[in-house]
Amino acid sequence: MKQYLDLCHRILNEGKWVKNKRTDKLCLTVINADLTYDVAKGEFPLITTRKSFWKAAIAELLGYIRGYDNAADFRQLGTKSWDANANQNADWLANPYRKGVDDMGLVYGAIGRKFPKADHGSLDLLKQIVDDLSNGIDNRGEIYTFYHPGAFHMGCLRPCLYSHHFSLLDGTLYLNSTQRSADVPLGLNWNMVQCYTFLALMAQITNHKAGQVFHKIVNAHIYEDQLALMRDVQLKREPFATPTLTINPAIKSLEDLEIWVTLDDFKVENYFYHPSIQYPFSI
């Protein structure tokens, strides 16, 4: 939590204004931020200076794990996070690759679970990683990536948190996650939860101890219409103690995550928080 608040203060104190072409808004921006989440110690990085909807963040992660490409599937899991980009993005609505209402196209897990090969066909990157790690193999390239520039035109949004690199060392599983762009008041709140939960899940289904997540953010920003709420409201609040996340121990495999796991299999305890803040969302 302190890391997150420190980053917010850094943006306010050191950030430079940049005009974002896609949203036509100014962003107060810094380059490079490194956050660490200690899964081994149970330090769940959930924001307490405002209410965070952690269930929706985990629902979105489950959708990425399953390779979903439709906002309706995400809603069924428990999040409406893709409704706007699938159905209100003017460029995507006019895109010939859009299949209809709620279609997201080739984004996130839809790329990672069927990564297009140059010689045709596709690779299931996540299954390869799970198979390797389950057999104690780390080939130094256990990377679940959603980043495919050749397919950007076939999806409603380029991936922001685009790469998850798993490493196995002496029986402990680590994760390096890379994010090209972070809407710090809104998106990063969820991304921190997702990185932590992803490592915890992968360690559990591959039968390893969980170590740390190292989360690199390249472009961290606060939109101009979010700035006052961050500066004058959220950063004036004192954080509460860190809550804890518990995952159903019956989850044993990738197939479990694909077939039957729901939000009921995740519990957060001792979560105390300040009132929610309605930050503007930029499509």
From Swiss-Prot:
It holds the Pfam family Thymidylat_synt. The keyword Methyltransferase applies. Pathway: Pyrimidine metabolism; dTTP biosynthesis. The active site is at residue 160. SUPFAM superfamilies: Thymidylate synthase/dCMP hydroxymethylase. It is found in: Cytoplasm. DUMP binds at residues 22, 180-183, 191, 221-223. (6R)-5,10-methylene-5,6,7,8-tetrahydrofolate binds at residues 183, 282. GO terms for molecular function: thymidylate synthase activity. It catalyses: dUMP + (6R)-5,10-methylene-5,6,7,8-tetrahydrofolate = 7,8-dihydrofolate + dTMP. Keywords: Cytoplasm, Methyltransferase, Nucleotide biosynthesis, Transferase. Signal peptide: none annotated. GO terms for cellular component: cytosol. Its EC number is 2.1.1.45. The keyword Transferase applies. HAMAP family: Thymidy_synth_bact (MF_00008). Catalyzes the reductive methylation of 2'-deoxyuridine-5'-monophosphate (dUMP) to 2'-deoxythymidine-5'-monophosphate (dTMP) while utilizing 5,10-methylenetetrahydrofolate (mTHF) as the methyl donor and reductant in the reaction, yielding dihydrofolate (DHF) as a by-product. This enzymatic reaction provides an intracellular de novo source of dTMP, an essential precursor for DNA biosynthesis. Homodimer. NCBIfam families: PRK01827.1-4, thym_sym. Belongs to the thymidylate synthase family. Bacterial-type ThyA subfamily. This is Thymidylate synthase. It comes from Haemophilus ducreyi (strain 35000HP / ATCC 700724).
